[in-house]
Amino acid sequence: MARAMDNAILETILQRVRPLIGQGKVADYIPALASVEGSKLGIAICTVDGQHYQAGDAHERFSIQSISKVLSLVVAMRHYPEEEIWQRVGKDPSGSPFNSLVQLEMEQGIPRNPFINAGALVVCDMLQGRLSAPRQRMLEVVRALCGVSDITYDATVARSEFEHSARNAAIAWLMKSFGNFHHDVPTVLQNYFHYCALKMSCMELARTFVFLANQGEAFHLDEPVVTPMQARQINALMATNGMYQNAGEFAWRVGLPAKSGVGGGIVAIVPHEMAIAVWSPELDPAGNSLAGIAALEQLTQTLGRSVY
């Protein structure tokens, strides 16, 4: 039976999952992320009618990393016809690590979906072709979505990622060899790493993504962010591809469309009701927040929410 929301529920959930801290591992392949304190834990909710709930470190900003892949897809959907996007990137789960080259080689440079690194790089390549200042445009979009004017990039994280970008560069060059990457590789990589280096809090993320819970409309904006069909499509992609190769396990445990990042954040959507953001930097072997998944599992069980 569904329960009403309040901050006390969120506080209780964080107390239940806090013992998991120490069992995961903070991302260390990006040096600027390796220094993040692993004990951080926060959760926030924004409902479609503008109510906010939070607990723990919900107001502390962190690197959103691959959560940004949803935002870059949203921007691409606003600048490209549907058929142009989906002829360059697929919609299916990969079943492989998010930075895999093997599958990309076998499938002639067409990434399985826009939420693995290869797919997100194709989307960024497309944005480079339509936007005069892709990084500035992303900031404008995110600031409008969350209603906060000082959202920015963490330059240290972006630089750290660029300095350790051999694998992502290899992915881009491999796609270029198949004709599925059209612009200067270092330029597009810089844009991609800056998007990943967006610094936001759980509260800001929940507010940013609430349009996906409301058929593409945000309560605080006059114009729709995307169409109802596009919102449905994005939620479907998040449900099938948003948690790296563990999307099935996450669907089993949590039952919501979601997107994670190696910064420890996860955004999840309850259609017609709310957007949820959690943050705990320690990751499981797939690169998803260990305590974050547990918190979302506790929340959906407590509230009686699931899309299944």
Swiss-Prot record:
UniProt GO MF annotations: glutaminase activity
UniProt EC number: 3.5.1.2
Record-linked NCBIfam families: Gln_ase (TIGR03814), PRK00971.1-1 (NF002132), PRK00971.1-2 (NF002133)
Reactions catalysed according to its record: L-glutamine + H2O = L-glutamate + NH4(+)
Family: Belongs to the glutaminase family.
Gene Ontology biological process terms from the UniProt entry: glutamate biosynthetic process; glutamine catabolic process
Self-association and partners: Homotetramer.
Gene source species: Salmonella arizonae (strain ATCC BAA-731 / CDC346-86 / RSK2980)
Top-level class of the enzyme under EC nomenclature: hydrolase
Protein name: Glutaminase
